Curated annotation (Swiss-Prot):
Part of the 50S ribosomal subunit. Probably part of the RNase P complex. One of its GO terms (biological process) is translation. This is Large ribosomal subunit protein eL8. SUPFAM superfamilies: L30e-like (SSF55315). It is found in: Cytoplasm. Multifunctional RNA-binding protein that recognizes the K-turn motif in ribosomal RNA, the RNA component of RNase P, box H/ACA, box C/D and box C'/D' sRNAs. InterPro entries: eL8/uL1-like (IPR050257), Ribosomal_eL30-like_sf (IPR029064), Ribosomal_eL8/eL30/eS12/Gad45 (IPR004038), Ribosomal_eL8/Nhp2 (IPR018492), Ribosomal_eL8_arc (IPR022481).
């Protein structure tokens, strides 16, 4: 497991995360954009790929998410993360800025918080 992966995410949770991402209204993609969104407090949920190399690219993101109280989770690969938001290329990190279905996001965040406990 990568250094920055703080908890294990079941497959069905990854699928639910991808579904919520695909229905999001506005997202920021890439480690730099996600870092800025977290620091500004505009991110509602951060999703990181588990296969980022070198790991240092995203290793700081879970730490600043915890400092800012922003929930975060993981998806297996950068390719899966890119596909979930409609990109033809892979991405290491995504932050949801605006969502269409607030209830689905809230439900997902509660499940993520349950994994950390």
């Amino acid at each position: 497991m990568a250094v920055y992966v703080k908890f294990d995410v079941p497959q069905e949770m990854e699928e639910k995360t991808a579904e919520v991402l695909s229905k999001s209204e506005k997202v920021k993609k890439g480690a730099n954009e996600v870092t800025k969104a977290v620091e500004r407090g505009t991110a509602k949920l951060v999703v990181l790929a588990k296969d980022v190399q070198p790991e240092e690219i995203v290793a700081h993101i879970p730490i600043i998410c915890e400092e800012k109280g922003i929930p975060y989770t993981y998806i297996a690969t950068k390719e899966d993360l890119g596909k979930a938001i409609g990109l033809e290329v892979s991405t290491a990190a995504v932050a949801i800025i605006a969502e269409k279905d607030a209830n689905a996001l809230k439900d997902l965040v509660e499940k993520i918080n349950g994994l950390k406990a």
